[in-house]
Amino acid sequence: MPQTSAWQLNDTTARPPPPPPPPGSEAGGSDGASMNGANTLPRVSKRVSAAGKTSNIPRFKRPHLPHSTRPLSAVLTSSSSPVVHRKISPSSSAPSTSSAHRRFSHLPQQHFHHHIHHNQTAVISEETLTTPRASTLNLNQTSVFPTAISQGSMPNSGTNTAEASMTSSVCAMETEGTNGDELAESRDMVSEMQRRCRIGPSGYPHLLKAKRLRFYRNGDQYFKGIQYALQSDRVKSMQPLMEDLMKTVICDSTALPHGIRHIFTIDGAQRITSVDQFEDGGGYVCSSTDAFKPVDYSRAAEPSWRLTLANRYNRHLETKKLALSVVEPCHENTDFVFPRIIKVIRNGVKPRRISRHLLNKKTARSFDQVLRDLTFVVKLDSGAIRKLFTLSGRPVLSLQDFFRDDDVFVAYGGNEKMAADDLLVASEEHKSVGSGTSSNMRRTSRRSTMPNRNESLRHDRSGSVIPDQDQQRLPPLLDEKFQLVRLIGDGNTAVVYEVIDKTNNDDRKAMKVIARENVIGKEHLIEMELAILQKIDHTFIVQLYDHWFVDDSYYLSLELIEMGDLFEHLRIVRRVPERDAVRMMTCLGQALEYIHELGIVHRDVKLENLLIVKDEFGELGVKLADFGLAAEMPKDFGVLSTICGTPTYVAPEVLNKTGYGCKVDIWAAGVILYAILVGFPPFQSSDGSEQDLFSAIMSGEFSFPSPSWDDVSWSVRHLIMCLIHTDPFHRYSAGELLNDEWMVNLGDVDPEYEEWAHRFVQSKMHVEEEQETPYEYYTSRRTSMDELSESAAVEFSYSCES
């Protein structure tokens, strides 16, 4: 009877050699775990020290043997006695009476001539028992690797030797009377085990080839990418991979402000969710958000073609006179770069198109980059922009010229010549260019030309809308229904009148008029505002009653709020008590929670757009107004990218152009809460410069200076820090704002919570707060409202799609 084959998995990690099995144990294999083709993980056994104490620390010591003396990993023999495989090392000092020596001593010496010299005895050293072999597979069956053995040089055909894995040893014993079916079954089982254990013909595990990948930054067309070798046996999930990539140069603070949270294929067609999806040699894009920015990443590492110039002062030469050459990417000094908005006038027939472009550390890395970006934005008929001049006639020759006093430029193509008339701004263009441009084309003092109120950053919706006295009348269709009372407000895009509704018991309402000069080409923006206003109906949002489109102008009938806005109220009272601030923030929080649940972002939450109301008990509240910049979030869970808002209240993710969502309204709410408590905003600039203001906003660093904040609770300071957080993922939502301890308890929190908030705020503040001198305190109080009205709020109405 042929012996029954059995797979035995014996744990040999740091164990002494087992005693010889009793006769007949080959067939049963009762003391081993049955494999049945499964790739069972080995157990780590406890080892016994010399002192007899048990240790749970596994011994994984790999012997340092030269390649020529590596031991055999598997032995196939025709001996009738079972063979338990152990690594064999040439050691004359090992005892020859060991059990392993007795088992291998009967084999001919030439069987080991590749691994053991003829003058040495084949023994098993005790040191070799500490090899990283996890298990021993004993196969009592006929020749296991006939193909591999037949190709080797075996002096004795009766005994065949082959190498197996270093993590598992396979031994076979040929028996008489073995039929073909059992032999085929044994070979199938061994082949399956080979595949699962990755046993190669050399006896060592296959080294899994690492996948060579290249990773890019989302939206960064100038980053060449980095090479990364992905070893699937070491990195088995996406989280460790992202953490490893975060340690490399790819994690740029501007391109990836929130780290790596998503990885896309290079074309953006697929988001990678498993390491198995990576393909060798492929390119992938790392992103902080789920919005993929389509850029030709594969060409980022290629040299760029540009005009060969003898020096930087002949860029105005005609294109045909210049040759093309390949240049390496230039690394210009950008220490002077700060976030600012420039206006570029497209040369041509007046009135000319005026584009606005944001410059920051990301978009102004070199002069050539700015020219390429402006070419895409301005879209000259003659092609690329080759020349730029300020309104004073000074040519723009370097990157630093964009960050001087002038912020209005005229763009020309290669074949266009500058004329003196080109530098004169027409009356139709003057409003779009901004108040910084005067008739003599020189900017006057920034503080003397800034508006008295914060103006929003809007896109091509500016223009003079204040009508003459003779024109302050409604069209005949509306004149029959409404009677004009007085002008109560004006802005960039509209004027607001108080009217009497003749058809409804002489109710007083507000009439918002958007003049025709602001309608042409902007109908979709106004229609979006109307569509949003028709969707919403909330107690703390100004209600839209009706609207008309007459004589190319829009007329909106709105709820009238007679007490004015919070900005004017703060100019009078200077600061608001905490109890009143709680009620105002509750009104604002409920309004924001309502519109955010509808997927609507206001994008222009500020003091001027919060109208003061009183309830029947005389308590103050606010209503949210002016949805001129409001937008609906994309249905595919994307983000918005249009740069808009008011400088004092704009969130850092808007300036960084990384995409944003509803949390920009929460940031603005935090700025408002800070301002109403002490009378000045958290981010301000001493000289009204855009550089200081935007730098402070993007850093997110602010303080609670004394003595202005001495009488303000620590719990509300904690709330402000949760609202004004540079990371929108860690910033409060509208619901969290309403559920804050300070809000729920109407400013009267428990002493324990107040103490906890005190410790929290002090631990999180970036810089030690300095005590204000009496003069500094006086000037901060005296100019606090000037900061609100003038701090970087020059009418740089802009909006640019990324």
Curated annotation (Swiss-Prot):
Q: Where along the chain is ATP bound?
A: I488, G489, D490, G491, N492, T493, A494, V495, V496, K512
Phenotype of the disruptant?
Maternal-effect embryonic lethal resulting in dramatic spindle positioning defects in one-cell stage embryos.
Q: Which PANTHER family match?
A: SERINE/THREONINE-PROTEIN KINASE
Q: Does the keyword Repeat apply?
A: yes
Q: Which reaction does it catalyse?
A: L-seryl-[protein] + ATP = O-phospho-L-seryl-[protein] + ADP + H(+); L-threonyl-[protein] + ATP = O-phospho-L-threonyl-[protein] + ADP + H(+)
Function comment: Probable kinase. Kinase activity may be involved in positioning of spindle poles in meiosis and mitosis. Plays a role in spindle positioning during asymmetric division of one-cell stage embryos. Affects spindle position by promoting microtubule assembly during anaphase. Plays a role in the assembly and stability of oocyte spindle, perhaps balancing the forces in the spindle and maintaining their morphology during metaphase. Plays a role in cell division and in embryonic viability up until gastrulation.
SMART domains the record matches: DCX (SM00537), S_TKc (SM00220)
Q: Keywords, A to Z?
A: ATP-binding, Cell cycle, Cytoplasm, Cytoskeleton, Developmental protein, Kinase, Nucleotide-binding, Repeat, Serine/threonine-protein kinase, Transferase
Q: What is its main location?
A: cytoplasm
User: Which EC numbers does the record give?
Assistant: 2.7.11.1
Q: What is this protein called?
A: Serine/threonine-protein kinase zyg-8
Q: What is the lineage of its organism?
A: Eukaryota, Metazoa, Ecdysozoa, Nematoda, Chromadorea
The chain positions of domain Doublecortin read 211-298, 340-423
* Subcellular compartments: Cytoplasm, Cytoskeleton, Microtubule organizing center, Centrosome; Cytoplasm, Cytoskeleton, Spindle
Protein kinase domain segment(s) = 482-743
Family membership noted in the UniProt record: Belongs to the protein kinase superfamily. CAMK Ser/Thr protein kinase family. CaMK subfamily.
The scientific name of the source species is Caenorhabditis elegans
Give GO cellular component annotations, separated by semicolons: centrosome; cytoplasm; meiotic spindle; microtubule cytoskeleton; mitotic spindle microtubule; mitotic spindle pole; nucleus
- Biased composition of type Pro residues is found at 15-24
Subunit annotation = Interacts with tac-1.
Q: Which residues form the active site?
A: D604
What the entry lists under SUPFAM superfamilies is as follows: Doublecortin (DC), Protein kinase-like (PK-like)
